[in-house]
């Protein structure tokens, strides 16, 4: 048996996150040799840093260890250095929102590049933008929406599946209307505005319109203050947690349905291709027989 693994301290986690932001993911040896972090991470190896960063990444993005294990199986390992750096900034922001007591500000993307869309909320906005911009009489189909997103945004490896899932979700909640495989924005959504938007869009809209603490002098709320705010809104913390759990369950159900639909579409496409090949072979056989009979 090897030596027991030491539990990571908050100082070590902070040093790892700061090191990844400074040097990039995969630069474990560089982080360990950096004099700023070497003292704090002296008891850690390259493998320790790699494993811990993987746990931080997936847990921050998926929210639980069970979902993290599924995500590790599905998440592609390929990606450019620029994508890795942008992902690292997002992960650290999701994990704790600060490094060394300072707010993390994502660097501006270089000229000529598109910032990769963030999950769910930004994808919903991109889908609505695509439908509005394409200006089809009865609305664009899913393929046209995907093509628009591919042409105007940097597509992540799993973006196609996510867009399919969000199209189904937005249809279920009434934001979109689907008819004969074409999507259009519902009249209720356009007429009632914010009241009919999906919870994700409302949350992001509120977040964007909220001034930063340093701009209006408002301090960050403590846990007790947050609990008080929840109570004022008419929900206890337990009710809020239950509502959040239901939202997560609905999102997972929608994702599962989207994956099943994608599998069925792939199967139908394969069957159609096989039928096409069979038809071509049959035509060749008929032509050969007719040619033989004319001799």
Curated annotation (Swiss-Prot):
Bilayer-spanning residue ranges: none
Amino acid composition bias (Basic and acidic residues), ranges on this chain: 205-217
Biological process terms in GO annotation: nucleosome assembly
Keyword Calcium: no
One Gene Ontology cellular component: chromatin
Domain H15: 119-187
Expression sites by tissue: Ubiquitous.
Entry keywords, A to Z: Chromosome, Coiled coil, DNA-binding, Nucleus, Transcription, Transcription regulation
Coiled coil regions, renumbered to chain: 239-277
Keyword Transcription: yes
Ranges for region Disordered: 100-120, 191-220
UniProt GO MF annotations: DNA-binding transcription factor activity; double-stranded telomeric DNA binding; protein homodimerization activity; single-stranded telomeric DNA binding
Classification via CDD domains: SANT_TRF
Main location: nucleus
Quaternary state and interactors: Forms a homodimer or heterodimers with TRB1 or TRB2. Interacts with TRB1 and TRB2.
Sequence similarity: Belongs to the histone H1/H5 family. SMH subfamily.
Annotated protein name in UniProt: Telomere repeat-binding factor 3
Species: Arabidopsis thaliana (Mouse-ear cress)
């Amino acid at each position: 048996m090897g030596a027991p693994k030491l539990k990571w301290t908050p100082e070590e986690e902070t040093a790892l996150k700061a090191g990844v932001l400074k040097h990039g993911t995969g630069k474990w040896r560089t982080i360990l040799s950096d004099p700023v972090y070497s003292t704090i991470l002296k008891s850690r190896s390259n493998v320790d840093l790699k494993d811990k960063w993987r746990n931080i990444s997936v847990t921050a993005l998926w929210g639980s260890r069970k979902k993290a294990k599924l995500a590790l199986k599905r998440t592609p390992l390929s990606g450019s250095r620029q994508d890795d750096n942008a992902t690292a900034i997002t992960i650290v922001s999701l994990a704790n929102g600060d490094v060394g007591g300072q707010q993390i500000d994502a660097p501006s993307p270089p000229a000529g590049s598109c910032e990769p869309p963030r999950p769910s909320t930004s994808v919903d906005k991109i889908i609505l933008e695509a439908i509005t911009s394409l200006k089809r009489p009865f609305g664009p189909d899913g393929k046209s929406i995907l093509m628009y997103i591919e042409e105007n945004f940097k597509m992540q490896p799993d973006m196609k599946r996510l867009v399919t899932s969000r199209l189904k979700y937005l249809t279920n909640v009434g934001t979109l209307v689907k008819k004969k495989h074409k999507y259009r924005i519902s009249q209720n959504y356009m007429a009632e505005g914010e009241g009919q938007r999906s919870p994700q869009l409302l949350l992001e809209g509120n977040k964007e319109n909220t001034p930063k603490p340093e701009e209006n002098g408002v301090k960050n709320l403590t846990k007790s203050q947050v609990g008080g705010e929840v109570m004022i809104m008419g929900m206890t913390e337990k009710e809020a947690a239950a509502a959040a759990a239901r939202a997560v369950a609905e999102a997972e159900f929608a994702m599962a349905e989207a994956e099943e639909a994608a599998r069925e579409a792939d199967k139908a496409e394969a069957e159609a291709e096989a039928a096409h090949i069979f038809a071509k072979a049959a035509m060749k056989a008929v032509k050969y027989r007719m040619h033989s009979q004319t001799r």
